[in-house]
């Protein structure tokens, strides 16, 4: 039996090169990061999770996100750019870039996840200005 729904369903497709790049140990130069993301922007995903504004100690691969933004061509793309932030400072930096439409915050109830992703405990994460 099919389930009837009276509310509209909307699906947003997100591509996350940031997630892939942050796991690569060998540094990817700004030009190469921008080239990859520009190619993804041409596809037309709803959202492109492209970089992060976190401590370079936490994710060295994405330390140049601000430089990558300057090389992105969003003029003919319908994709919205999303960046990950680990705290209020990262959120403030991200808002300096009009190109960034969405911010993601890696919250979890897992202490291990929080320690690895934002170097925070659950209590500390709950107290941030981002929640």
Question: What do these predicted regions represent?
Answer:
Residues 46-71, 105-120:
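Glycine-rich, proline-tolerant flexible connector loops at the mouths of alpha/beta enzymes
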Residues 35-51, 95-102:
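Catalytic domains of carbohydrate-active enzymes, especially glycoside hydrolases
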Residues 61-66, 91-97:
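Distinct, well-ordered alpha-helical segments
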Residues 7-11, 44-46, 74-81, 99-101:
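Short, well-ordered coil/turn segments that N-cap beta-strands
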Residues 58-83, 124-131:
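Alpha-helix-loop-beta-strand connector modules within alpha/beta enzyme cores
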Residues 2-25, 102-117:
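N-terminal small/glycine-rich loop or linker at the start of catalytic domains
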Residues 16-18, 53-55, 84-88, 108-110:
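Active-site beta-loop-alpha junctions enriched in small/polar residues
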Residues 27-34, 82-92, 115-131:
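Glycine-rich anion/phosphate-binding loops
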């Amino acid at each position: 039996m099919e389930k009837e729904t009276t509310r509209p369903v909307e699906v947003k497709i997100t591509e996350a090169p940031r997630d892939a790049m942050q796991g690569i140990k060998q540094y990817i130069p700004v030009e190469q990061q921008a080239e990859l993301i520009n190619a993804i922007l041409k596809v037309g995903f709803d959202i492109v999770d492209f970089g992060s504004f976190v401590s370079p100690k936490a994710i060295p691969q994405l330390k140049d996100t601000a430089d990558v933004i300057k090389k992105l061509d969003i003029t003919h793309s319908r994709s919205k750019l999303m960046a990950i932030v680990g705290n209020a400072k990262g959120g403030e930096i991200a808002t300096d870039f009009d190109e960034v439409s969405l911010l993601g915050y890696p919250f979890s109830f897992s202490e291990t996840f929080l320690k690895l992703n934002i170097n925070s405990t659950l209590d500390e994460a709950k107290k941030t200005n981002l929640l």
